[in-house]
Amino acid sequence: SRGLGDVYERQGLEDHRVQFTPDVMPADILGFNMYQKNTGEFVYYPGTIMCNLFLADEINRTSPKTQSALLEVMEEGRVTVDGVSREVPKPFIVMATQNPKGSAGTQLLPESQLDRFMICMSMGYPDLESEIAIAKGKSTAAGFGELRAVLQAQQLVDVQAQVENVYVHDSIYAYITNLMNKTRNSNYIELGVSPRGTIACVRMAKAWAFLQGREYVIPSDVTDIFMDIAKHRIVPNTKARVAHVTEEAILSQIIADTRQPASYMEKVD
């Protein structure tokens, strides 16, 4: 998180980090109106969400009420306080960390909240060489000073627009939809991926194709990111839990059972 903040500052962007403890209130995130005696008016004081990069650290330690404060802004890019809506700056990104399920003092994130995160990744433990480097102090805060920005704010917005223009063939749309439908009809899944997850898969596949230097999406772009966009959106049922079948195993089988399209590059103008 420290490294991300430094990079954003070098890009001329604003980042805010909030430690989500149980006493954090929605107003701390969204902002609040305060009455000014001298003018007789209410003045809006922006919350920490008014930034380009918002990092919610240990998001599952705070109350469900505070967690839900992020629902509107993550979906619509705006906050509403006392009936007045305000746009957040662009570009706008929300990132969060959470403690393992069952850890002391944690609250489970509701499905509606999880669904708004495009991807979910587990950092896990570092490999042996990386941990040795950490032990030697080679991956400390001092190294963040060497980070440099390769894009400025407007350039980042322009790149996002380019990603939106990446071509997706109808057969790829059908392939993605088939994958999502199979999560909803699996014998091991109680709650499958929502239509919002389908949209996230398309957008993430476009971004992955763009990073590979392509202007069109191929099936492997979808399979490469499918696990990261779907794993946090499905809820295994009792049968899966009793059989100790993991989310990864379920989704891997769905990928294996879904036929990939043979044609996906013919662009129709």
Outline where the language-model segments fall.
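Short, small-residue-biased leader/transition segments that mark boundaries at the very start
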Residues: S1-Y8
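AAA+/P-loop NTPase substrate/partner-engagement loops
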Residues: R10-K37
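The start of beta-strands in P-loop NTPase/AAA+ ATPase cores
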Residues: E14, N52-L53, H232
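Canonical AAA+ ATPase core
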Residues: Q36-E41, R61-T66, M74-L151, L156-V166, ...
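Conserved alpha-helical scaffold flanking the Walker A/P-loop in AAA+ ATPase domains
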Residues: Q36-L55
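Walker B catalytic acidic pair
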Residues: D57-E58, A69
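Conserved AAA+ ATPase small/helical "lid" subdomain
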Residues: E146-C201
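C-terminal engagement/docking regions of AAA+ P-loop ATPases
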Residues: N185-D269
